[in-house]
Design a protein with these regions (language model features):
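Short hydrophobic/aromatic helix or loop-helix immediately within or flanking a transmembrane segment
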Residues: 40-44, 55-80, 175
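Short periplasmic/luminal acceptor-recognition loop of GT-C membrane glycosyltransferases, typified by
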Residues: 58, 421-504, 522-536, 572-578
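Transmembrane-helix signature of polytopic, membrane-embedded enzymes
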Residues: 98-124
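Membrane-interface transmembrane helices that cradle and orient dolichyl/undecaprenyl
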Residues: 109, 113, 144-167, 199, ...
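Short hydrophobic alpha-helices at membrane interfaces in multi-pass membrane enzymes
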Residues: 149-174, 200-210, 300-303, 348-356
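Perimembrane helix-loop-helix junctions
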Residues: 155, 184-224, 285-288, 398
């Protein structure tokens, strides 16, 4: 018979596998028309032979080469794109599980509960609940893997440490491709090399920078193999004309990044903010070295205030996936202050917590998705936050400030509740479709085969597939905004500057067709406004016009189609214009 210890050793992996099973089941539910389709359409476009920067004018294309191996493998296996939506979702979940499981093994010496909570919080997170191989997910995976490699490097022999640091630099360079603003973080290792105190300790940093340089060279070699440097520079200004780019100034974005955590949890600020302020001021007033040197009664009061703020923060987290992660991170700061300096989990704080916050701040500045972009960093920071909270409660119990049972109960509560809340948000809420109870129709054809959506969306989806596959034209095709997935229904060239939400009145289209007259579409599908519109999402405030499909009827493309004598045909989902 297995001992109790052996059974407990199996509990963590068992719960991780159970969470994996639930996430794989969730992969089959809901159909997001725009975002996931856009990522796959980028890979589709490059697989067909289109050139980066020259033919595609969206900044998100930088990460598309990472999707090409997956896309090519799926086509080799299936002979087409049928079911690729579901395959991408499954691939993303499996990659995230691999990171979470490795994290569990790494943090296991800190305690089973701490390791399990940290790994589950990393596993169940998805930015805004978006499925598939988005640049959010890959950036999260690349950066998280790099942090984990650093964590391993901290306690390995010098030879292995150099290799781990090199690998960390390489994989984190890939995160920069997904979010270029992350490059600012590389200032830190460069500054470290210039410090006199760094003498004799520069090897790991140089290995890290070497890995970054090696990955950058491989990426640039691929890019310049596909497109010449002169062509890239010629078309770069058009790519930077991206209408979805943020127009907010950099100082304002940086200020918002610093204020966001306080604003998001303003209702509990009196509790958690007051506890943090008191923890910083009281040691100075009492002339002691740290909060841990204050009387037990004072420390209990500070912990109680922080826990009250934590509870309010969880209760006000609403439907936003990642807010519970931030709540735990804020509690972890308080836990750090209450823990004696010699007992603090410094390695976890340096390898996960602080880089996670930096990662989130960069996403706030570099993305137009607001606070939800920041939550990417908070999810990774939880790999350090969970050990910080666990260490605090363990120390308070050991020294008698808390009863042992109370400390264990609090540790279980504060680590389990964010996991359960985040898990519910990931499984039960949807991103740009309809509530799960309405997603009763299973798609059986095309790129989204295997997904369940509403009967209305299923009918619209089938009609779009039919409209494109039934066309006898073999020239470029253009589909209005909300159905970038439709490009995956055919191997015809893409007749648009980008597959991302292109409207009939897009200013870029006229410029694009002047640059690429051969890309003027032979088939144009103008979707009705009601087609593809979602009724439920986690963050509806991010896009004020998320369901707009075509744009103004007097836009450039509409007038040009009429001038060229294109023949319109009415379909159940909109109008198809065909070249004569």
């Amino acid at each position: 018979m297995r001992s109790d210890s052996s059974r407990r050793d199996l509990l963590g992996p068992g719960l991780l596998l159970a969470a994996l099973a639930l996430l794989l089941w969730r992969c089959t539910l809901t159909f997001c028309w725009s975002d996931e389709g856009f990522y796959l359409a980028l890979a589709h476009r490059f697989w067909l032979g289109d050139l980066p920067f020259v033919d595609e004018w969206n900044t998100a294309q930088l990460y598309a080469p990472f999707l090409l191996p997956f896309y090519a493998l799926w086509r080799a296996i299936t002979g087409g794109t049928t079911g690729i939506y579901l395959a991408a979702r499954v691939a993303a979940v499996l990659l995230q599980f691999a990171l979470a499981f490795a994290l569990y093994r790494a943090l296991r010496p800190r305690g089973r509960g701490t390791a399990l909570a940290a790994s589950l919080l990393v596993l169940v997170y998805a930015k805004a609940g978006i499925g598939g191989l988005s640049y959010y997910t890959l950036c999260y995976l690349f950066f998280g893997t790099g942090l984990l490699l650093f964590y391993f490097a901290c306690e390995t022999a010098s030879t292995a440490r150099m290799g781990l640091c090199f690998a960390a630099g390489a994989v984190m360079a890939l995160a920069v491709v997904c979010m270029p603003y992350l490059a600012v973080l590389w200032v830190l290792p460069v500054v470290f090399l210039l410090l006199p105190s760094a003498h004799g300790r520069r090897g790991p940093v140089l290995a890290f920078l070497g890995g970054t340089g090696a990955a950058a060279l491989v990426y640039l070699a691929w890019l310049l193999h596909r497109v010449s440097l002169s062509a890239l520079l010629e078309h770069l200004p058009f790519v930077l004309m991206d209408p979805d780019g943020s127009s907010t100034s950099l100082p304002v974005l940086a200020l918002k990044a610093l204020v966001q955590p306080f604003y998001q949890f303003r209702f509990g600020l009196l509790f958690w903010g007051g506890a943090l302020a008191a923890s910083l001021l009281l040691p100075r007033l009492r002339q002691v070295n740290s909060v841990s040197a204050l009387p037990a009664k004072v420390r209990r009061l500070l912990l109680s205030a922080a826990l009250a703020g934590f509870a309010v923060n969880l209760l006000t987290s609403g439907d936003m996936l990642g807010k519970a992660h931030l709540a735990l991170c804020l509690l972890a700061v308080q836990g750090w202050l209450l823990t004696p300096p010699a007992r603090r989990p410094v390695r976890e704080a340096l390898c996960f917590f602080l880089p996670g916050w930096a990662f989130g701040l960069v996403w706030q500045v570099g993305s137009n998705t607001g606070f939800s972009g920041m939550t990417l960093g908070f999810a990774l920071a939880c790999a350090g936050a969970a050990p910080m909270v666990g260490a605090c409660l363990h120390c308070l119990s050991e020294e008698g400030t808390l009863a042992r049972r109370t400390g264990r109960a609090l540790a279980a509560l504060v680590l389990c509740v964010p996991v359960l809340l985040s898990g519910w948000q990931r499984l039960a809420l949807e991103y740009r479709d309809a509530p799960l109870s309405q997603c009763t129709q299973r798609l059986t054809i095309g790129p989204a085969a295997g997904l369940a959506t509403t009967p209305e969306h299923a009918a619209q989806y089938a009609a779009i597939c039919q409209a494109l596959t039934g066309s006898e034209n073999d020239g470029p095709v253009f589909v209005t905004a909300l159905a970038p997935w439709a490009y995956l229904c055919t191997d015809r060239p893409m007749g648009a500057s980008t597959s991302w939400r292109t409207y009939l009145d897009s200013e870029l289209l006229e410029v694009y067709y002047r640059q690429h007259p051969e890309r003027f579409p032979s088939t144009v599908l103008v979707l009705d406004e009601a087609v593809g519109g979602y009724t439920s999402t986690l963050q509806p405030e991010e896009n004020p016009l998320p369901n707009q499909n075509s744009g103004r009827e007097d836009g450039f493309l509409t007038l040009e189609l009429a001038r060229r004598g294109y023949t319109p045909h009415t379909t159940p989902v909109g109008t198809v214009y065909e070249a004569g």
